[in-house]
């Protein structure tokens, strides 16, 4: 992991190029959505507006390369839109094809990783891949808002150094917990996963071994899903990708 806290965010923003402007912003109950004339990106809606935004006039009309810098904002509502802007650039069908990252429905982001005997940490209330709990030695779920059986996220500093595989929700990019989580996971295989995850190769040089996320292919469908605050995950409106270091 690079020692500079914001190195990861700088690497993410540096890869966003061109002058494509943002044409629409939508804040749903669960997802923040950024649209351009040709693309769309998501970021998990994250409460937290006590700090003034980096862009007081908002992100509407800004080019994606500028708006993506807001991922580093400590105004977490703005940061969700910043990551959505980055995803509108990175998570496109054309990029998926160019990088060869399509992950078919019957495969999972842990493909090729032997789960037997592993000590696994899961950041965020996720189920993980099928068979994980049968194969692994131990599975710890760590959650900011813990449910029954989850550890509170304060336990990360104790549990994660014991793990050799850690699955991390993409929303950790937005709430700024990711840099420290990666420090705690320096001896583990790390997978950043979820619809908020950008298909950004530079992040693989920042302590992340795998990036697993969503490329939206049904733009009208996902837009209605976000605006109507529909339940369920958004993967039915696109294709999964897996970008890995190995």
Predicted regions and their residues:
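Conserved mixed alpha/beta catalytic, RNA-binding, or beta-rich assembly cores of soluble enzyme
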Residues: 81, 87-91, 119-159
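A short, gly/pro- and small-residue-rich
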Residues: 138-140, 178-195
């Amino acid at each position: 992991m690079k020692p500079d806290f914001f190195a990861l965010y700088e690497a993410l923003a540096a890869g966003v190029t061109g002058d494509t402007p943002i044409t629409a912003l939508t804040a749903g109950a669960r997802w923040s959505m950024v649209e351009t004339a040709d693309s769309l990106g998501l970021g998990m809606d994250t409460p937290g507006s006590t700090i003034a935004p980096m862009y007081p006039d908002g992100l509407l009309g800004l080019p994606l390369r500028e708006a993506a810098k807001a991922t580093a904002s400590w105004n977490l509502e703005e940061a969700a839109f910043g990551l959505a802007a980055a995803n509108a650039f990175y998570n496109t069908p054309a990029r998926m094809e160019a990088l060869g990252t399509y992950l078919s429905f019957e495969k999972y982001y842990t493909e090729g990783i032997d789960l037997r005997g592993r000590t696994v940490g899961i950041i965020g209330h996720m189920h993980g891949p099928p068979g994980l709990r049968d194969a692994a030695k131990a599975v710890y779920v760590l959650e900011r808002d813990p449910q029954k059986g989850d550890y509170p996220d304060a336990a990360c500093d104790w549990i994660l150094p014991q793990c050799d595989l850690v699955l991390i929700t993409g929303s950790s990019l937005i709430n700024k917990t990711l840099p420290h989580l990666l420090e705690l996971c320096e001896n583990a295989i790390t997978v950043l996963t979820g619809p908020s995850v950008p298909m950004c190769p530079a992040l693989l040089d920042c302590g992340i071994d795998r990036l697993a996320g969503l490329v939206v292919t049904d733009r009208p469908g996902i837009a209605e899903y976000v605006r109507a605050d529909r339940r369920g995950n958004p993967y039915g409106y696109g294709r999964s990708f897996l970008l890995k270091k190995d």
